[in-house]
Amino acid sequence: MKDPISIQRIQQLHPQVRQRFTDFITECESTFGITLRIMLPVFRTIADQDALYAQGRTTPGNIVTNAAGGTSYHNFGLAVDLCDLADGGVNWNYDNATLVPIAQKYGLEWGGNWVHIKDKPHFEFRNGHPENPTDLLAAYNAGAIDNDGYLLSI
């Protein structure tokens, strides 16, 4: 992984998936000669997710997510949003579809393949969980988390 900011941000992921995402990003950068940036926030609290969901609905701003609190893999530290760094800035137009074969190799799901909404910067590790991670939310609500707020088991 080339980007020093992404190296810091990867530490926000669930400890059990940090190496998986590091290897995925490193292989993508090596294969395609690009530099990827993990965009913020990586790990969102449920309250943070609810605030993002309210944006453009009940609070000012544009709608930026269709996931309410507890329904995003970001809430469990199991997702990243990636952009290409090019010409000294973030390139939101990079075709992340080129990264999908490598993502699949690491067991990652790409948001650009979703039916109801396309989230092309988004990659998540489901580990057999459904699109809406209700089982992860139930474990979280039951208190099955460590001192840092990560689920004990994913």
Language model segments and positions:
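Stable alpha-helical elements in mature extracytoplasmic
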Residues: 17-24, 48, 95, 99
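Catalytic cores and adjacent binding grooves of peptidoglycan-active enzymes
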Residues: 67-154
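Short, charged/polar surface micro-motifs in flexible loops or helix N-caps
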Residues: 44-48, 57-58, 88
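Acidic helix-start/capping segments at beta-turn-to-alpha-helix junctions
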Residues: 38-52
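Short aromatic/hydrophobic-glycine micro-motifs
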Residues: 33-34, 57, 107-112
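Cytochrome P450 catalytic domain signature, combining two hallmark sequence patches
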Residues: 56-68
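Active-site acidic/histidine clusters and adjacent loop/turn architecture
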Residues: 1-41
